[in-house]
């Protein structure tokens, strides 16, 4: 009897100790489907679980350290673009929180999983770079590293949401939710997916 009481107490302790994003979304049941991006999308419950996407970490001090930043925080930071939004982290956190609530209402899935799927689907795998010095310049197709795929995906997703919300009756949180849901499905309604296909098409032409 004492043993079962101890087990119950242990389970209760685990439940109370679990860190959930905005006290709602669990990190335990999320996974990264693309094996090459596992090390670059920070969602491990032991390392990256936070109540709010604001860790105040110094991720830009050293090269590649930003790969250790929780992925939801990277999305939040990327929303603080265009001069008038610089440094408004509280606003960015609020946008992400509302977008996650909308995603949960529309898709009934864990919004953290939707964000991960959107990033996996939106990162281009091939790009064209300029080769040659002054005079003759040609473009050559190159593979993209996993970290740059994640960086590009986050940039394209937030850019798409920002452009959709500009001069629109919809709030940016609604636009971000739509963008993430469409990108997670791989739908061409997503700005990020369209841009990714365009980048890969140009690269294919320059192989």
Swiss-Prot record:
- Pfam families per record: Ribosomal_S7 (PF00177)
Which InterPro entries does its entry note? Ribosomal_uS7, Ribosomal_uS7_CS, Ribosomal_uS7_dom, Ribosomal_uS7_dom_sf, Ribosomal_uS7_euk/arc
**What are the entry keywords?**
Acetylation, Ribonucleoprotein, Ribosomal protein
Q: Which GO terms describe its molecular function?
A: mRNA binding; structural constituent of ribosome
Residues recorded with modification N-acetylalanine: 2
One Gene Ontology biological process: translation
A GO cellular component annotated for this chain's UniProt record is: cytosolic ribosome
Domain of life, source organism? Eukaryota
**PROSITE patterns the UniProt entry points to:** RIBOSOMAL_S7
Tissue distribution: Expressed in epidermal cells of root tips, lateral root primordia, root hairs and shoot primordia.
Which family, according to the similarity comment? Answer: Belongs to the universal ribosomal protein uS7 family.
This protein's name: Small ribosomal subunit protein uS7z
Species whose genome carries this gene: Arabidopsis thaliana
Which classification does the entry list for the species? Eukaryota, Viridiplantae, Streptophyta, Embryophyta, Tracheophyta
């Amino acid at each position: 009897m004492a043993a079962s009481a101890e087990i119950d107490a242990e389970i209760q302790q685990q439940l109370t100790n679990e860190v959930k994003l905005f006290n709602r979304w669990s990190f335990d049941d999320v996974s990264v489907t693309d094996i090459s991006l596992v090390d670059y999308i920070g969602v491990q419950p032991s390392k990256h679980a936070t109540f709010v996407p604001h860790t105040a970490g110094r991720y830009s001090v050293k090269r590649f350290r930003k790969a250790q930043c929780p992925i939801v925080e990277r999305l939040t930071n990327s929303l603080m673009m265009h001069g008038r939004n610089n440094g408004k982290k509280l606003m960015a956190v609020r946008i992400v929180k509302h977008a996650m609530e909308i995603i949960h209402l529309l898709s009934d899935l864990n919004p953290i999983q939707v964000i991960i799927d959107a990033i996996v689907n939106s990162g281009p795998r091939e790009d064209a770079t300029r080769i040659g010095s002054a005079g003759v310049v040609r473009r050559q197709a190159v593979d993209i590293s996993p970290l740059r795929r994640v960086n590009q995906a986050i940039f394209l997703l937030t850019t798409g949401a920002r452009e959709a919300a500009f001069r629109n009756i919809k709030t940016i949180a609604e636009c971000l939710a739509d963008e993430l849901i469409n990108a997670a499905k791989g739908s061409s309604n997503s700005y990020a997916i369209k841009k990714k296909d365009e980048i890969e098409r140009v690269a294919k032409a320059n192989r």
